[in-house]
């Protein structure tokens, strides 16, 4: 017998068998926890868990699971037990009532590289301190101050569309909205004039879109062997692209150097820097309750770019798609635009924010396509909520995409119907059925900012142009299975001059 296996010594065999034993024993450990708790859900495969059981697109998978298992179910993301919840009473408790006590933190993959202290990743007191300092940068007063900057960029956007409409070009809508988002974010965050609308090859777009493209092998490896996370971390493995993070770090450091003293633009970066001098009672590299360290400022600024770019862009892309495929909605919206700003007049902030139908259209588009398909929280302690025990350290996941397409909450959920949000119908929307920006103290900080920049671009464009479907338009859309909610292939439409 041993003669057939000449290459392996006894020691090698022992090692190999030990490894196989470890592999098998380790594999089964996390599974069965939901069965014990009496929570339904798909049966896991070892190591792989229940990933992609019903559909390869993870958020479509959530829709199928919700149909099958109801409002609470258990899944295993590779080896990690994840409790999915769409029950409104539980959502209220998790996201709002017990946010500060049991559910303060998001799931942390620990491979955050430089961004470990970004507000979306920071935990507990750290998070609360950073969030409190950032909040004033996103009040409606501050956003109103940024409006003229946004308008300038939106003006460039519409100007760049003129020739495209004139030549009857087929456009990949992301190619126009991506540069718009980048330019708005860079201007409002750092007063940086990128003008990527007119210089589409600018490296900043490339880096901004790269950051959230998590490397799949790392995702799978950390999923299979979460106990190796500290090792990966020490080896410098990160989910966020290091070249892209470094790119923004250099840009920002240069801006800060140039901005010594005299100039004081009202951008997000300056608001953070100003908070440093306000809380001036010890060294600036030491955190205190009133201010951010230099590193923290850097992380917030980078996170703002990255979190804002992709989400605002896809929101605009889906709006264009929904309007092109629902021309009667677009017509009604254009009527509202024309009566609010007669004779293609300049868009004003207050009037824009008061447009009712526009708000319904944007909300309905975000209902069907919320950029973040899932939210999550970690339970700090074992806690019983609405009769369901949630164990310490368990991931609670809110499948927003599935929630917002739940046929019990949204009749004919696949239909694009802005009137769901009209004054008359709004009352029938159940609380906690709609959360494209999350809810509670840990909701999206940039919500109002995003709403303004999205509405402005949409109104400016629809004043002079209409979107229309063409042969190249994919209907229905095939969805992307990586990252944020998005189309697998670029959405292509045509522009018509009004
Ligand atoms: C935007 O602002 C720049 C100066 O900051 C100006 O030259 C340009 O004409 C403006 N563009 C639009 C479309 O308002
Ligand atoms: C802190 O305040 C002192 C005076 O009280 C001032 O000299 C110093 O420049 C301030 N430091 C910072 C970082 O603003
Ligand atoms: C649209 O959604 C936002 C938040 O997502 C909300 O504040 C607003 O009231 C909604 N508008 C309507 C008309 O429902
Ligand atoms: C829309 O068209 C009118 C003339 O038809 C023009 O004056 C205006 O600048 C255009 N607006 C935009 C945002 O392109």
Stretch-by-stretch model annotation:
Residues 1-6, 274, 483-498:
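C-terminal helix/juxtamembrane-tail motif
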Residues 3-117, 123-129, 151-159, 244, ...:
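N-terminal membrane-proximal hinge/A-helix region immediately C-terminal to the signal-anchor transmembrane segment
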Residues 33, 103-115, 122, 145-314, ...:
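Cytochrome P450 heme-thiolate monooxygenase catalytic core
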Residues 41, 84-86, 92-94, 192-195, ...:
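Classical protein tyrosine phosphatase
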Residues 50-70, 250, 254, 347-386, ...:
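Conserved cytochrome P450 K-helix E-x-x-R motif and the immediately C-terminal K′/meander segment
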Residues 302, 307, 386, 423-454, ...:
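Cytochrome P450 heme-thiolate "Cys pocket" and heme-binding signature region
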Residues 327-329, 447-484:
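Cytochrome P450 heme-binding "Cys pocket" and the immediately downstream C-terminal segment
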Residues 398-425:
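Conserved cytochrome P450 K-helix/beta-meander segment immediately N-terminal to the heme-binding cysteine loop
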């Amino acid at each position: 017998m041993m003669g057939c296996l000449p290459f392996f010594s006894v020691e090698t065999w022992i090692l190999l068998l030990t490894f196989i034993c470890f592999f098998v024993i380790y594999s089964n450990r996390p599974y069965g926890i939901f069965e014990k708790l009496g929570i339904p859900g798909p049966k896991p495969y070892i190591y792989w868990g229940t990933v992609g059981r019903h559909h390869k697109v993870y958020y479509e998978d959530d829709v199928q699971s919700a149909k099958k298992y109801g409002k609470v179910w258990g899944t295993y993301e590779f080896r990690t037990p994840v409790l999915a919840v769409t029950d409104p009473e539980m959502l209220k408790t998790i996201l709002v009532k017990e946010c500060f006590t049991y559910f303060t933190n998001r799931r942390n993959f620990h491979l955050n590289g430089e961004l470990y202290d970004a507000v979306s990743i920071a935990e507990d007191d750290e998070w609360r301190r950073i969030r409190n300092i950032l909040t004033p940068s996103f009040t409606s007063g501050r956003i109103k101050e940024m409006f003229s900057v946004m308008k300038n960029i939106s003006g460039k956007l519409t100007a760049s569309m003129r020739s495209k409409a004139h030549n009857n070009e087929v456009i990949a809508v992301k190619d126009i909205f991506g540069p718009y988002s980048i330019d708005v974010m860079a201007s409002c965050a750092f007063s940086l004039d990128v003008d990527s609308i007119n210089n589409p090859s600018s490296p900043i777009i490339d880096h901004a879109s790269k950051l959230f493209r998590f490397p799949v092998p790392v995702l799978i490896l950390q999923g299979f062997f979460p106990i190796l996370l500290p090792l990966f971390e020490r080896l410098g493995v990160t989910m966020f692209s290091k070249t892209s993070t470094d790119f923004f770090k250099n840009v920002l450091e240069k801006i800060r150097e140039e901005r010594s003293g005299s100039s004081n633009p009202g951008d997000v970066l300056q608001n953070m820097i100003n908070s440093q001098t306000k809380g001036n009672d010890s060294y600036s590299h030491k955190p205190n309750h009133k201010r951010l360290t230099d590193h923290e400022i850097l992380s917030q600024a980078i996170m703002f770019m990255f979190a804002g770019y992709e989400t605002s862009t896809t929101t605009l892309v889906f709006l264009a798609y929904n309007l092109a495929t629902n021309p009667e909605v677009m017509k009604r919206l254009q009527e509202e635009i024309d009566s609010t700003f007669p004779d293609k007049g300049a868009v004003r902030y207050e009037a824009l924010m008061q447009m009712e139908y526009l708000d319904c259209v944007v909300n309905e588009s975000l209902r069907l396509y919320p950029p973040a398909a899932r939210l999550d929280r970690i339970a700090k302690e074992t806690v019983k909520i609405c009769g369901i025990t949630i164990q310490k350290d368990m991931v609670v996941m809110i499948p927003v995409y599935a929630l917002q397409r739940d046929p019990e909450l949204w009749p004919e959920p696949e239909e694009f119907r802005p009137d769901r949000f009209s004054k008359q119908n709004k009352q029938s929307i159940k609380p906690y059925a709609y959360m494209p920006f999350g809810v509670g103290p840990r909701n999206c900080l940039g919500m109002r900012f995003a709403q303004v920049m999205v509405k402005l671009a949409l109104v400016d464009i629809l004043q002079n142009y209409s979107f229309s479907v063409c042969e190249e338009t994919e209907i229905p859309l095939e969805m992307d299975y990586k990252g944020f909610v998005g189309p697998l292939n670029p959405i292509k439409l045509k522009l018509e001059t009004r």
